[in-house]
Amino acid sequence: VALNNGHVVITVKPMKPVLRVFNNDGSYYINRSGKRISADARYYLDVPVACGNFDSTFTPQHLLPLVDYIYTDSVWSSLVSMIKVNTATNIILVPMIRGHVINFGDVENIENKFLRLRHIYRNILPVKGWNYYDTLSVKWAGQIVATKRKKGLAAPVVKIIDESEFEA
């Protein structure tokens, strides 16, 4: 806006990224309206990460309703670390909790799928054990399908140091 005194007033509204995308085009962010924002390797924003197979029929923008749901719920935003897109109907959520992945299916009926997941996390995993299942699936309507782990998880690479070894 130009003022009478010859000055120009510029109003800038920064775009706020809500998702980091890694695909064949490289890495970039998108905001809530789906606009692409360049990513700079010098800076990092703590937003959900999506990677996988995107094309003209299923773009990262199609994930925005899912990202919005995750982003507005403190439990899910703390739990979900990555969204992996195999196909438009085979979306995998990778939780911070090691040991299993979540087959979310497509981006339809998001609230219902998260209600079923909440049931699993509150009622089933505390009883069966956090490493009992390999995959938790809410892909199909009205169902929770859990795939039992065939093998145990690899032991974490942690060496316990006996402090008595260092005594003189």
Predicted regions and their residues:
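Amphipathic heptad-repeat alpha-helical coiled-coil "stalk/arm" segments that mediate oligomerization
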Residues: 1-22, 85, 135-144, 148
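A sequence-composition feature that detects small, non-aromatic residues
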Residues: 2, 39-41, 50, 88, ...
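Short, basic/low-complexity N-terminal boundary segments at the transition from targeting/disordered tails
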Residues: 3-6, 61-65, 76, 115, ...
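Extracytoplasmic segments of membrane-associated envelope/inner-membrane machinery
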Residues: 11-88, 94, 101-102
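A short pocket-lining beta-strand/turn micro-motif at the edge of beta-sheets
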Residues: 89, 100, 132-134
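A short interface-forming secondary-structure element
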Residues: 98-108
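Extracytoplasmic/luminal low-complexity segments enriched in Pro/Gly and acidic/polar residues
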Residues: 107-168
